[in-house]
Amino acid sequence: MLRSRTKCANSLLQIRKKSHLRQVISFSSRELGLTEHELETIDKLPFFDQDRVNTRKRYPTTKRQAYLNEKLPAVKLLFGEDPQYPGFISHSLPSMMPIPFEATQGTDEETIANRLSVTKLLTKSWCELRHAYDVYAKIPMFEGKPIIKGKEEHQRLEDETHSLAEEQRAFEKDFEVVIPDDDFHKLAESWFASLVKMVNLFTDGEAREVLCHGYLNKKKARLVEGPIIGDDDDDVLVSGIIDHLILKLRDVPVSNNVLPLRLENAIVSKNCEDIAVVFDQLERAGPNLQNKFEIMVSDVKTRFMRKIPSQPSVLKASKLQVMYYRYFMEVLGQNPQETYNKLLINAQRRGFDVNRFIDPAKVLSMMATDDMIRMDMYRLKNGDAIGFEPFDDSELNVSESATYDMSDYHDIITDARVIQKYSDFFEPWAKPVTLKYFAARLAQMYHHLRPLLSNKLMIEYYYNGDNFHNIIFEFDPKLLRESSSDSAKFWFGQRDIEPISRNLKNFLTFCKYCDYESVCSWKRGGNDMCKELGTDLAKIQKS
């Protein structure tokens, strides 16, 4: 027994030498009888990674310090000081405070009512206490160089895969009418872009930045699979953006590097002007497509060093993130009619009128970006059905005097190229273009992807533009259900905040880089525990 306790003390001692906790444990290796060989052996243990432990503490920049000067007092004011540690923030949520989900509603960061994002469900990717502090602070996350660089890398990858942004910029540069860019039209554009990207999967073999969403029930604390009632506040919208969808051969073993399979015109017609034709081609190719091909869901992580994260909780959260995406894609593909309704509820939760007309200038901009919807626009103009009953049978709740009319463009547009390509549309339309149209086509597209979804998922790690490592793993529905329920209980106030375990390894790998390190009562209490343990171990050694 004495020998095992001595070994424990030895381990603690070596951590003391390499950490900011050296003032807590104050006995030497000589006192514990540690040999040089034992020191060397302990030093080689995996959790004493020199690259991590010996990294100097990064002091905040002027901008970051200003950010902390605003955030830390705000959190201390809300949570109060810990009675045992004056000056340190309490790690318990005061009883008069709203639950975490209610605290997010109406903030600058979270302006959409009754909504969460996939990343917000990953409450234990780092430390849930830090996550909770940030939620109640209601201050947007500080965007340092790693975050900015990560966004740039995601944009670079998207631009390399899709020409949508380039085509749109080229059209808008010379277009003679102002093209709206408000949040309503941004949503319409993102739905259109996701539709085009998913079709491109079957020609180019990959798609990036594709929208998906699901719903989380408040009372039951679980993900919702069936239909959604629009005015039911118990079902919370959870939105996500899939970094990467990859088409591959089903029977080919998955290696560390999965290359997209370009089918060009083999399944669907490239540069097709009729999305209805694309759907018909996918329908006819269905059995053959499902037998030969599959679609992998993947997430892209950018790193500030050529190394994947070492913390198990971070890796688990990254896997769960991709599992959410995979799950949402499957549910969205189950029933096009239900998905159509879910998309409309999605828009309504964002505060948008699904019957509102999409500005004609925006519609022309979309067609200039990709002609895939051109024939559908003719159908709407002429009052014809698009072949999707929930949309074709729907009625618009608009004024009888409101008409969708592009006639003015005859007098406004002078660009011969635009006139030649789009003048057929410069007249009154029988049916307007609304979010309902894009919801209809997007719902059908999700349905065509569902049978191809692979149970193999992937995380791609990038450093300075180089995909240096991938992790491939299996979809685990049971783990996803358990984790989503645990997260729901946090957000909806059905359990207490659960900080990381108090041990030296966690202090080194988590607390060291936390904004709240200097004022966290949970860590301060952990330091005292370690100090007491060190004293007890020293006494054991002397006895």
Swiss-Prot record:
Its main location: mitochondrion. GO terms for molecular function: 4 iron, 4 sulfur cluster binding; DNA binding; metal ion binding; single-stranded DNA 5'-3' DNA exonuclease activity. Its cofactor is Mg(2+); [4Fe-4S] cluster. GO terms for biological process: interstrand cross-link repair. Signal peptide: none annotated. Keywords: 4Fe-4S, DNA-binding, Exonuclease, Hydrolase, Iron, Iron-sulfur, Magnesium, Metal-binding, Mitochondrion, Nuclease, Transit peptide. It is found in: Mitochondrion. Pfam families: Exo5. Binds 1 [4Fe-4S] cluster. [4Fe-4S] cluster binds at residues 127, 511, 514, 520. It comes from the Eukaryota. One of its GO terms (cellular component) is nucleus. Its EC number is 3.1.-.-. It is an enzyme of class 3 (hydrolase). Residues 1-39 form a transit peptide. Belongs to the EXO5 family. Monomer. Single strand DNA specific 5'exonuclease involved in mitochondrial DNA replication and recombination. Releases dinucleotides as main products of catalysis. Has the capacity to slide across 5'double-stranded DNA or 5'RNA sequences and resumes cutting two nucleotides downstream of the double-stranded-to-single-stranded junction or RNA-to-DNA junction, respectively. This is Exonuclease V, mitochondrial. It comes from Zygosaccharomyces rouxii (strain ATCC 2623 / CBS 732 / NBRC 1130 / NCYC 568 / NRRL Y-229). The lineage of its organism: Eukaryota, Fungi, Dikarya, Ascomycota, Saccharomycotina.
